[in-house]
């Protein structure tokens, strides 16, 4: 997934589709995996992935490096704060934040 400079974002959410799919498969819990492919401070300056725990926003990308795999519960509230929202958006840019994600989904 690409979150481009100029405001690429993902609103805070829980992975409802993964939660529903896990229930259909009679799983109580499912974990998502996310591979970080860019580095905050190098590939983009502001924004990035976060989780919300105990009503506090945690910027996990302050601590993470390129190649790190994050594993989190599908029920965790998470998202992406605007990537370099001080820059004018350019939908053709390849610059910004990149991740690869694996989730559970079943029709």
Task: Describe every region a protein language model picked out.
Residues 29, 44-107:
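Catalytic core of Fe(II)/2-oxoglutarate
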